[in-house]
Amino acid sequence: MPDSALPPCSILILAGGRGQRMGGRDKGLIEWQGLPLIAHLQRLVRPLTDDLIVSCNRNQERYAAYADRLVSDDSLDFPGPLAGIRAGLAVARHPWLLVLPCDAPRIDHALLETLLQAAGRAPARPWMLRCGGQWEPLFSLIPTHLAEEIEHAWRQGDRSPRHVLLPLGAQAIELAAGDPRLANLNTPELLAKHHELK
């Protein structure tokens, strides 16, 4: 069950990418430390929500085991993470949507709690992690009432989550450059490098 001290949120794990850096493999299903990457994220966030959404564009039957609901992009050409965010916002059951990428298994509960607690400080605005001055829009907390504004930006041709969220008054959770919790294990080399790390 979700922690009652934190705002009720839906959680979206983005696993709908092309996996180009992995030779076209489905990143969320690649194993790391004996489990698919998606399983590490699911195990971490499951206690925080009763509305866990996975955005995926293939292997839906395998992803179903890790989600309450699956969403897919409305285009077959892998249009990018903003498409998955739109799909998640469209079905989210809670006032907030916490967005995470499937290839970041080193993120921890403390960082997610920090992000969720920030919601009370600016309840009408999105929050993003900012690592060494670099915005990280795929680690974000978005009020679901902004869905229509995000949809409008999409219709205007914007495909960048950062470009869409910043004009909506996005606030930052600041992290030091190189924070290992945000490591994206999106190449075979990075998977190998982080394999022994806990």
From Swiss-Prot:
Predominant location category: cytoplasm
Keyword Cytoplasm belongs to the record: yes
Annotated positions binding Mg(2+): 103
Catalyzed reactions: Mo-molybdopterin + GTP + H(+) = Mo-molybdopterin guanine dinucleotide + diphosphate
A single GO cellular-component term on record: cytoplasm
Role: Transfers a GMP moiety from GTP to Mo-molybdopterin (Mo-MPT) cofactor (Moco or molybdenum cofactor) to form Mo-molybdopterin guanine dinucleotide (Mo-MGD) cofactor.
Family named by the database record: Belongs to the MobA family.
Domain notes: The N-terminal domain determines nucleotide recognition and specific binding, while the C-terminal domain determines the specific binding to the target protein.
Protein name in UniProt: Molybdenum cofactor guanylyltransferase
Taxonomic lineage of the native organism: Bacteria, Pseudomonadati, Pseudomonadota, Gammaproteobacteria, Pseudomonadales
Gene: mobA
